[in-house]
């Protein structure tokens, strides 16, 4: 992202830290629940289409081009941020559309200690 957009995003967080923290907390909670619909809903309200294209969708397409050949050869673990998991342009959908089997890894996320 251009530095001007990064700065604007940072300034929004500084101007409204409670809102930024609440949005972050909601996203983390949805991620821990593996609630993809909630993640998609939260992200749709937090980022515009142009931002999502640059930060999520273009990167998902680039990763797909690299991952598909590798995943056809062997099993691969892919770890990405929550925004890359959802929607019609999400990484799991793109990989499935390429004929690959995709499944989440089970387990529970550890809660961070308070005050750290």
Where are these regions (language model features)?
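C-terminal structured interaction module
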Residues: 75-115
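Hydrophobic, often amphipathic alpha-helical segments used for membrane interaction and targeting
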Residues: 2-72, 90, 106-108, 112-115
């Amino acid at each position: 992202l251009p530095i001007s957009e990064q700065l604007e995003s940072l300034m929004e967080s500084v101007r409204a830290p409670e809102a930024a923290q609440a949005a972050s907390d909601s996203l983390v909670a949805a991620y821990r629940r593996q609630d993809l619909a909630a993640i998609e809903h939260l992200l749709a309200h937090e980022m515009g289409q142009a931002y999502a294209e640059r930060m999520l969708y273009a990167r998902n397409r680039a990763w797909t081009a690299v991952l598909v050949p590798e995943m056809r050869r062997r099993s691969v673990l892919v770890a990405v941020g929550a925004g890359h998991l959802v929607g019609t342009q999400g990484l799991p959908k793109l990989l499935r559309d390429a004929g690959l089997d995709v499944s989440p890894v089970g387990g529970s996320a550890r809660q961070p200690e308070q005050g750290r």
